[in-house]
């Protein structure tokens, strides 16, 4: 597994995998260098993106794998590589979120992330189940 910074030639892959991304946000991600394409044996297999919260806390906002490659341990590998990248760049904590009805929470807990709060969106334009926040000291 290899994490490579997002580039222009990843456009079609990203658009096929993450339907909420816009042309503008795609370009912003390239410029910000906060998104990686996940590569396995010469093939694009997923996308990982994050942003920095309060100038010092990395917040994972997307880890998406190609549907055909799920269940192979690639998410675990991608998280380990991302956490190594964060440590190498001086970060000591990582934060992420997932809806409580998504399976990803079990992966994150297995990797050492602990629950640290949640947001309720019921009755808002973003009506969805509870958004669960998790953190890990690196």
Residue spans for each PLM region:
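Acetyl-CoA-dependent GNAT
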Residues: 2-62, 66-67, 79, 85, ...
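Short hydrophobic/aromatic beta-strand or adjacent loop that forms the aromatic wall/cage
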Residues: 33-35, 129-133
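Active-site beta-strand termini and strand-to-loop segments that position acidic
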Residues: 39-41, 135-138
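Conserved beta-strand segments that form the floor/walls of ligand-binding pockets within enzyme
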Residues: 59, 64, 95-97, 133
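Conserved acetyl-CoA-binding loop-helix of GNAT-fold acetyltransferases
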Residues: 71-84, 109-110
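Short glycine/proline-centered loop/turn elements that form peptide/ligand docking sites
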Residues: 75, 79, 101-104, 121-127
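Conserved GNAT acetyl-CoA-binding A-motif
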Residues: 86-98
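Conserved catalytic-core motifs of GNAT/GCN5-like acyltransferases
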Residues: 95-97, 114-131
């Amino acid at each position: 597994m290899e994490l490579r910074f997002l580039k222009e030639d990843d456009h079609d892959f990203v658009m096929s995998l993450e339907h909420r991304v816009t042309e503008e946000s795609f370009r912003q991600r390239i410029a910000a260098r906060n998104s990686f394409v996940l590569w396995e044996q010469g093939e694009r297999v997923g996308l990982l993106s994050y942003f920095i919260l309060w100038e010092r806390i990395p917040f994972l906002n997307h880890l998406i794998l190609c549907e055909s490659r799920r269940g192979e341990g690639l998410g675990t590998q991608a998280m380990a590589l991302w956490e190594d990248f964060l440590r190498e760049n001086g970060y000591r904590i990582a934060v992420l979120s997932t809806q409580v009805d998504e399976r990803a929470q079990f992966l994150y807990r297995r990797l050492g992330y602990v629950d640290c709060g949640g947001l309720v969106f019921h009755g808002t334009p973003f009506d969805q189940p509870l958004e669960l926040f998790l953190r890990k000291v690196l």
